[in-house]
Amino acid sequence: MASKLKIIPLGGLGEIGKNLTIYEYGKDMFLVDCGMGFPDQDLYGVDLVIPDISYLKANKNRIRGMVITHGHEDHIGAIPYVLKQLDMPIYATPLTAAIIELRLEEHDLLYHTQIFTKKPGDKFKLGCFEIEFIHTNHSIADSVALAIKTPIGTVIHTGDFKIDLTPIQGGMIDLPRLGQLGNEGVLALLSDSTNVERPGYCASEARVIDCFDELFKDCSKRIIVTTFASNVHRLQQIINVAAKYKRKVGITGRSMENIMRVATELGYVDIPDGVMMDMSQIGSLPRSKTVIVCTGSQGEPMSALHRMAFSEHKQVTIDAGDRVIISASAIPGNEITISRVIDELFQKGAEVIYDRNTPLHVSGHACQEELKMMLALTKPLYFIPVHGEYRMLCKHAEIGKLMGVEPKNVLVAKNGEVIEITKRSMRATSSVPAGDVYIDGTGVGDVGSAVLRDRRHLAEDGIVMAIITLSAENGKPVTDPEIITRGFVYVKEAEALMGELKRVVNESLASCERQKQRDWAAIKGRVKSNISGYLYKTTRRSPMVLPVIIEV
């Protein structure tokens, strides 16, 4: 049997999101997490990004399962798209499993997938691997780290974590078990790097409840709170404070409604009698007696808060004096959309409270001192920083060395690298495909660089179409060409330019006729080249030019 453990990250290194790591030994392999990433602003029309799973498809008979650390989209968002191509069982904690089931139901995959529910402390076998779930703290309940026992030693994969000494529910991270594993001997540690640039400790989730209390007790108007739908700890805090001040709570936003339902069914949210109220009835109460909890903390265009801000919500209108609380920090790249929503709310007379001026949100990721504690407890032989942009991985690597890991045993890896570990060495030996796969609507991977280049071109300069009608008998023009533009100029205000473009097309056709050129591709090429040259010369713009020939 092979004596080398292979760890292959397909996503999550050098980036935020898209977390997917393969563990491989001999004939057995399994996945840890299967997340999506958010598209950059220049990925026009792309809804989300998932990892390239070519390597998994080439080794599908060796896959023993998928193990999920928690229910955030950057760790579960790609699951439906992977399961459409590969069949494998999923192992997760109860709340995480319930959230995954919601996603699979949307894709008609629920009844075709085996999901095994495990709790912290449970151990189970996947081929030659034994996996143990270890309770951690994070901004979503039921988060776990993994202790992965392999034939050559134990690997700890932290997932996203923080060390919260006063958690809202679920108890503290299981530091004793991590320390016990460290004393027994940890071969390698793969640890969350998201907050490595922040010194000190991450604030406790309990800090937020005092802020909510202050904002609720002095408000005589309606309160609207938006937060991450998956943050059931935060939802519980909002419900508790609303009950304290005798306000009814309504939930709006499909993802939040779904997660609230499953979290309540599983016992992760405790709702006092008479607090919740259907959104269809909440408008009948005085505004001073209501709280609306909604999606939209990232300014998402179809979210409940966005629709409220732009007067598109069917049940809620924003009135002057309404207090809107944004209890979330901006995911990088979402700042502009959030700012637009906040501006619109201010224009409607709402009082908007957000993270820049009030401590309404705390991170779910460990800061430097917590990362040091994880290293001190586990005492790994090898250390691989994960879950972060490249500078974060480098910073975390330095902390690893500071905490006593031999410099030669610290590896800053890249997506796709095959990391081979033995009892005596760790090195990146080769690589597998690990690029981005773009999801656009129902299409998976059908948007490539050429399509994105065209979309970028259209977005920047628009399109000019030249419709040319030629005779089937002699190949000569039957009518004047028609010029159609989109995103280039307003035609009614550029009639002279349209006339000049028709002239350019006619001259191009005449030139082709003189040269007895009948090949459509050549004619289109001539027309395109001449229009492009004329437009750049006269406007200094380079729209996409698309000649279309119709034969009659």
Task: Please provide the spans of the model-predicted regions.
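Short glycine-rich phosphate-binding loop at a beta-alpha junction
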Residues: P89, I384, L546
